[in-house]
């Protein structure tokens, strides 16, 4: 059986899309995690000048941003395990499903990391001035984190079906 670029069902380039899905899951979630970590860390450093005793309590946004990168790692490893050679029956349908899974996880992670960074920065600065804001900041951070979790769940459903 020969595989050429004209064969629609088992195209030789189908695994490319699957690997692009795995790569995009990792790349975009790590970009979101990096932004969230950096933005939150700037707020922690600014707050630490006024209230150094609150630094350890304010590390929560940085930890939550780092978890976003783990979501991408999980999805990328699952997708990598599902991609096969075109000669083994890997078709364009699977390739596009894996690309969609990777983009779903990656872009949800990017948005979640962005939200965590902004909320974390403003939240730790506000908590330094008014400690009652801490609970509200944590709730908003949880809602932001769940956006990345939703993306991972949808990506796992797309990637394993």
Curated annotation (Swiss-Prot):
It holds the Pfam family ATP-synt_C. InterPro entries: ATPase_proteolipid_c-like_dom (IPR002379), ATPase_proteolipid_csu (IPR000245), ATPase_proteolipid_su_C_euk (IPR011555), F/V-ATP_Csub_sf (IPR035921). GO terms for biological process: lysosomal lumen acidification; necroptotic process. Residues 37-58, 120-137 are cytoplasmic. The keyword Cytoplasm does not apply. Gene3D superfamilies: lithium bound rotor ring of v- atpase (1.20.120.610). CDD domains: ATP-synt_Vo_c_ATP6C_rpt1 (cd18175), ATP-synt_Vo_c_ATP6C_rpt2 (cd18176). GO terms for cellular component: membrane; proton-transporting V-type ATPase, V0 domain. It is a multi-pass membrane protein. Its main location: membrane. It comes from the Eukaryota. The chain crosses the membrane at residues 16-36, 59-79, 99-119, 138-158. The record marks 145 as: Essential for proton translocation. One of its GO terms (molecular function) is proton-transporting ATPase activity, rotational mechanism. Signal peptide: none annotated. The keyword Oxidoreductase does not apply. Keywords: Hydrogen ion transport, Ion transport, Membrane, Necrosis, Transmembrane, Transmembrane helix, Transport. V-ATPase is a heteromultimeric enzyme made up of two complexes: the ATP-hydrolytic V1 complex and the proton translocation V0 complex. The V1 complex consists of three catalytic AB heterodimers that form a heterohexamer, three peripheral stalks each consisting of EG heterodimers, one central rotor including subunits D and F, and the regulatory subunits C and H. The proton translocation complex V0 consists of the proton transport subunit a, a ring of proteolipid subunits c9c'', rotary subunit d, subunits e and f, and the accessory subunits vah-19/Ac45 and vah-20/PRR. Vha-11 and vha-3 are transcribed on a dicistronic transcript where vha-3 is the upstream transcript and vha-11 the downstream. Proton-conducting pore forming subunit of the V0 complex of vacuolar(H+)-ATPase (V-ATPase), a multisubunit enzyme composed of a peripheral complex (V1) that hydrolyzes ATP and a membrane integral complex (V0) that translocates protons. V-ATPase is responsible for acidifying and maintaining the pH of intracellular compartments and in some cell types, is targeted to the plasma membrane, where it is responsible for acidifying the extracellular environment. Involved in necrotic cell death. This is V-type proton ATPase 16 kDa proteolipid subunit c 3. It comes from Caenorhabditis briggsae.
């Amino acid at each position: 059986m020969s595989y050429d670029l004209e064969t629609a069902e088992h195209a030789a380039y189908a695994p490319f899309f699957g690997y692009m899905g795995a790569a995009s899951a990792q790349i975009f979630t790590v970009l979101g995690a990096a932004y969230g970590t950096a933005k939150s860390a700037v707020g922690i450093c600014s707050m630490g000048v006024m209230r150094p005793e609150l630094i350890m309590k304010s590390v929560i946004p940085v930890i939550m941003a780092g978890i976003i990168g783990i979501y991408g790692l999980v999805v990328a490893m699952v997708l990598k395990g599902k991609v096969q050679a075109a000669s083994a029956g890997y078709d364009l349908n699977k390739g596009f499903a894996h690309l969609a899974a990777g983009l779903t996880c990656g872009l949800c992670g990017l948005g979640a990391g962005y939200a965590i960074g902004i909320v974390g920065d403003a939240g730790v600065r506000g908590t330094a001035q008014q400690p009652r804001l801490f609970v509200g900041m944590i709730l908003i951070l949880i809602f932001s984190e769940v956006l990345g979790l939703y993306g991972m769940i949808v990506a796992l459903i797309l990637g394993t079906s």
